[in-house]
């Protein structure tokens, strides 16, 4: 499946455009930072953080734009084979629906690794030219970017299984991503609903990682979302291979969704959340004195 992706001109188009725009963004950012650094007399304490981390860092711009590329990548993973009829060959082979889905998903995130080479190369270059480069938070930010790519790929794969039209699959993926971005604003007047919609929202899930902080809640969110949409896709292919009533399909989808929400709700309780600040100066952590005051 990964080899088939590279036979597609769309995959090469994505790789070339992403590499060009990302490199141009990094070059422009570095130029501005070097200028500001010279004007300030070289007094900035953490150039690695300024260049790569935070809302205005290089990796934040990559995170903001990655949603454009993934739907184009995933739109044909299943819909192309469904439209051509070649999916029936997979159905007749001695492989399960889960194995088919897993193979296509691994191909998608494998291509995501190719995309990751561009920001990784930028980070390596930064480590060579920036004194006392703080690798740990930058690696966490890169992890956040890759987890986001994995989530987008799982969503796109599911949408590709719903239609034979690649454009419809791409548009559907963008719609799902838009819903997940804005769902956090629903039900704000009710505590329980607010907590559920807040957890379901993908908006801001990488903010802490882009600052070098790993939160268990965010990592679990990405794992649950990926698992949920891969389960959806597997069930969709299974229902295509054998007759399953629409009522049973609806109940199954609802059951998967409720289970995911339950996991997310309980793992996002304050007592369940673990936080790891990887910055060298523990910039995002409270001091020990502050923690003792809050404990009282």
Regions flagged by a language model, labelled:
Residues 71-91, 105:
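Transmembrane helix boundary and interhelical loop/hinge segments in multi-pass membrane proteins
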Residues 9-33, 61-69, 175-179:
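Hydrophobic alpha-helical transmembrane segments of multi-pass membrane transport/permease proteins
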């Amino acid at each position: 499946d990964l080899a088939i992706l590279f036979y597609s001109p769309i995959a090469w188009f994505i790789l070339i455009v992403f590499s060009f725009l990302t490199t141009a963004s990094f070059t422009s950012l570095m130029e501005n930072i070097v200028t500001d650094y010279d004007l300030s007399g070289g007094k900035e304490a953490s150039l690695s953080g300024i260049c790569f981390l935070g809302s205005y860092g290089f990796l934040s711009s990559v995170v903001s734009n990655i949603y454009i590329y993934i739907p184009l990548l995933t739109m044909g993973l299943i819909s192309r084979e469904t439209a051509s009829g070649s999916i029936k060959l997979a159905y007749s082979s001695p492989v399960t629906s889960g194995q088919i889905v897993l193979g296509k998903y691994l191909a998608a995130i494998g291509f995501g690794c190719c995309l990751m080479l561009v920001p990784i190369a930028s980070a390596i270059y930064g480590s060579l030219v920036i004194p006392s480069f703080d690798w740990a938070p930058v690696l966490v930010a890169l992890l956040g970017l890759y987890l986001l790519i994995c989530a987008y790929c799982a969503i796109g794969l599911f949408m590709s299984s719903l239609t034979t039209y690649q454009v419809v699959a791409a548009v559907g993926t963008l719609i799902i991503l838009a819903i997940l971005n804005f769902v956090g604003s629903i039900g704000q007047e009710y505590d329980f609903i607010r907590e559920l919609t807040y957890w379901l929202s993908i908006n801001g899930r990488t903010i802490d990682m882009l600052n070098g902080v790993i939160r268990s809640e965010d990592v679990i969110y990405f794992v649950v979302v990926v698992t949920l949409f891969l389960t959806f896709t597997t069930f969709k292919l299974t229902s295509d291979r054998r007759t399953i009533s629409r009522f049973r399909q609806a109940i199954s989808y609802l059951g998967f969704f409720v289970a995911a929400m339950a996991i997310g709700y309980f793992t996002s309780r304050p007592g369940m959340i673990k936080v790891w600040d990887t910055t060298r100066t523990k910039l995002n952590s409270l001091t020990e004195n502050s923690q003792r005051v809050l404990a009282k």
